[in-house]
Amino acid sequence: MLSEGTPILRIQNLNGGENWFYSDLDLPVDKYCEKGDLLYAWSATFGPYWSRWDHRLIYHYHIWKVVPGDCMDKIFAFYELKRITGALKASAHGVAMPHITKSGMEDWAITLPPLAEQKAIAEKLDTLLAQVESTKARLERIPKILKRFRQSVLAAAVSGKLTEVKENDFSEITIEGLAKERKYSLGIGPFGSNLKVSDYCAEGHPLVFVREIRAGRFGDGATKYVSSGKFDELRAHRVLPGDVLITKMGDPPGDVAIYPVNRPEAVITADCIKLSVNQNVAMTKYVSYAMQSEQFRLSVISISAGVAQQKVNLTKFRKLTLPTPSLEKQTEIVRRVDQLFAYADTIETQVNNALERVNNLTQSILAKAFRGELTEQWRKDNPDLINGENSAEALLEKIKAEREVAKSKKKAKEKVRKG
């Protein structure tokens, strides 16, 4: 693979990817794109894009270069393609669209007002959609702010700053010291041949996978099960409702969730850790919150090793400590964290709803633009630019004439080749 030459523009690069491939081939001029060229990705992430790079690129075959004729404004064409793509995605109702064919794209019916009105529409869309994108960017920053807010709440919780808990009210208790005083209260999933894919069943006792343990929330529904016989055989790896689950592997490891109280007993898989908390020492929810704090996450990373994927050393994990106050003070801490997290969740829900409305707003504005609603006053103010030789009808006749000329040239070339 070349490390220099002409960069090859792929869909990943259109979407911000910085991993480039290169070519030393000398290709026909139409296989290259320059800054400002209109492009269309017809696979994966559908839609129109601008070539925004200062140097010449070879565009990948999953990308088309769109060259509007003299009868169509290029910026107007970009927005028309954006509108059509949005309508196609909406009509798919969530079904993945594998690709768009070139012949299919050429059959699209497009809106084509007079050229002057095209430019007016493009200018209005530039202004309106820039405002939409600015609003969207501000909304998209809020979840990151909320993530930092939650971490600051957890940091305050385990330091006593969130409630009236003094620093000397905390005791550093090891993870194994927090476990119930019974066999198998702290452990990892089964190794290798102890649980094979061939042991999986369509029904029975559920398995818990790493993918279900994420950021304080347990994932939806088990997809794999084991038989009652296998379940008994793996009793050391059972997880009970209310147990704390920790990812043993990941990038980084250490995600935490509580196994829901309304779930049946299950079996954790290889890269999970389970902890049954001794309720005389700590509240399960307090332990979960303390383990989600940045301080504890860094401790977990410090005892992890691996190249492709980091894995937690269980022996060292047992010896990690959590700052643990009295049960009474834990109750107050959990109450305050619940309260603040609920507040953050409410804001996040509102933001997600607002983002959905903003995303719909783009398509709504485009639809209005191509129904002529954004330029109604412009047409009244500029009748000379949309009538006579500037009318849409005259534009259509010009396009038909250009097509006839193109057909004649094509036939002439074919005749020469046949010789």
Language model features with spans:
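Specificity-determining recognition surfaces
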Residues: 81-110, 206, 290-322
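Short amphipathic coiled-coil heptad-repeat segments
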Residues: 120, 127-168, 349-380
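Non-catalytic DNA-recognition/assembly elements of restriction-modification systems
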Residues: 107-122, 152, 165-191, 319, ...
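Sequence-specific dsDNA recognition surfaces
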Residues: 1, 5-35, 177-197, 211-241
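A short beta-sheet element
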Residues: 10, 24, 29-82, 209-210, ...
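Amphipathic heptad-repeat alpha-helical coiled-coil/stalk segments that mediate oligomerization
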Residues: 375, 379-409
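Short, solvent-exposed loop/turn positions at domain surfaces
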Residues: 26-27, 94, 194-195, 233, ...
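Amphipathic alpha-helical coiled-coil segments
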Residues: 336-350
